[in-house]
């Protein structure tokens, strides 16, 4: 029987803050706006050489030979690398170690790297790269999901569940068939979400510098220095102590720099080979090839609805997803699970079935992009709900408000919800936009759409399961009154450096100017797993909070003794430590540190963070759990020209449950940035591939490998926006804070689709929404057919054996009743890979630092 969920107690009573919750300048703001920030491509070292990668010109082929003879004649060429020089595979997930720094014998997409050329100048490297000749033996090319399902041979990868299916998932929570049978009405829809790329302002760049004793330092525009360090150590076959990774400031990442990449490993290998610094900066075209962008996903959604007077509830839902994963694994196993995992955290759903499949195709590999795996099903779900509301004659806002998931509850698929501000988010955007009064009543061509969303505040488990902290922070206090803060977090433009500094400054009562940051350096900083899954504020923030509170306690002991004041009366504020009862009695923070050092010696403290254990213990439950979930709601107003199908957003209202604002200005920037990215995806952005006609070879080609042709919105395309920051402090977050980097994007795309329906009565069930789609819907409407544009059917797919997991309401314990394979696994983790506590592991006489293999997960 599942234990009833108890609301976690706050670590201490709510307290007044001085810096937290107020607008303040970013700690890196001046450097960013004056151009003095050093990005990876800005770095230069003596005797530095340049490397270009020779990439495959065909999408699928065996490598029969490489001719370097003409390239070797180019003046300034220093050396080459091929696949035989870096034979060890790598990948971000333990279960998908399927990439090579350079392809040894086979290319899997147009753009796969084959040869690296080093030269003293960039021009020489380019010229030599063009003169490398590669002899290919073409193989059959697989272009999409249905083709991959129907074509098991030739296999693109040797691993995966079968044929060209990388991963298949099937799990049922509760009695879905019974729930559908009890429904008054059953609704079913099919949706498609096209893939797209991250398009950060900064292209990927890396500089590798060889040092004494066969050491190498890699400076890179990475979001995950810890995982890059791991990959370099593996592929280069040198001890971890010989590899240093420094994550430079990123000019945007959005998930696109969270894998270890070929060019990073090639740069390090070439630097060690030549004994000289090596720089690789990708062109924008190359970024399109290695991007790891959003998966194209085809979805089928079936929902049972019960009507009880004016109240509507979901009885059960079945979701099926099919992902086009491209040529490599990347984060794909996790991506597959994410298309179904978070479906249950917004609305009550007593029974839920999720089936998903990820296929390999001969395209650049897909991975995590802002919202990782969740924008696609969220688009489908919110449009699906809008159709239900219209069919039942209910205002879409009332439909959602009547079926919200409960705070402090456990979902059917065993996700633990804490605080939940979605009700307030909906109420804010509905009131601000006049949705109740205006929806369905605007002139033809003008419409309003509402949608909601939710996202993680950090993944509950690390990529490599272990008992160690997911984030660590170390403080060094010196006699000047300054505090040095060391942390492995990566600043990718989201303001994490400012959050780190603010948490420490708040606890110690000092100014941001008194903080010195050393971040994202694997030689100097404690491990932080990186900037992904919206984990940084909550996880790094909690580690920083713990380290700062430990430092405060040491200082308080010394000041209490010196001033003969109880520690409980000491206040840390305004660069002083003073008596709350007599503020004139106290010490400057500098003198307080000196007193503490005199008593305790050199001052340094550490903090770390490990997420709470998830109640789910079935195979696959490792994807979805989070210490907390953020919530968002959006209303979008659009105008549509029925004659052309052209549409434009007129205004966006967005509300986000942020828990507690660390810095409202930073939060607003993240919310509005997410909205703009969402508008780009629904308006125009798509990573599209097309087959050439057979008489032109039938090859699979990239349609938009440039910013000019890919199309992304500019300032001219963006509408006015009204933003509401909803604060419901969550006890799991530092000062109650939750994520803000990814969640606000999720409701934007479905809100637009719903607004277009309100404007012209056409349902476009796919993203992006192009004018011709609206026109075709209008033409169908005029002919008396359904006014819809989108996929017509979901293919028949064998998803394999279904895991049967009883829900909390059914008295389940978080395990699957038929997961015999997992029941045989004992050891460090539960059946889901959810970690035991350290104490449990030690009781079993196992090493707390031992990591477990994801093989077969």
What is the role of each PLM region?
Residues 27-31, 130-143, 223-225, 230, ...:
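Extended active-site and interfacial segments that coordinate phosphate-rich ligands
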Residues 90-95, 128-131, 220, 229-231, ...:
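Short acidic, glycine/serine/threonine-rich loops at helix termini
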Residues 244, 249, 253-275, 279-282, ...:
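Thiamine diphosphate
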Residues 152-236, 403-482, 617, 696-724, ...:
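Helix-loop-helix junctions that connect adjacent transmembrane helices in secondary transporters/permeases
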Residues 1-165, 186, 460, 856-857:
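Flexible, low-hydrophobicity surface segments
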Residues 31, 37, 205-210, 298-307, ...:
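Short beta-strand elements
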Residues 74, 83-84, 237-242, 272-280, ...:
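C-terminal catalytic domains of large/alpha subunits in multi-subunit enzymes
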Residues 22, 28-31, 163-206, 296-383, ...:
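Glycine-rich loop/linker segments at domain edges
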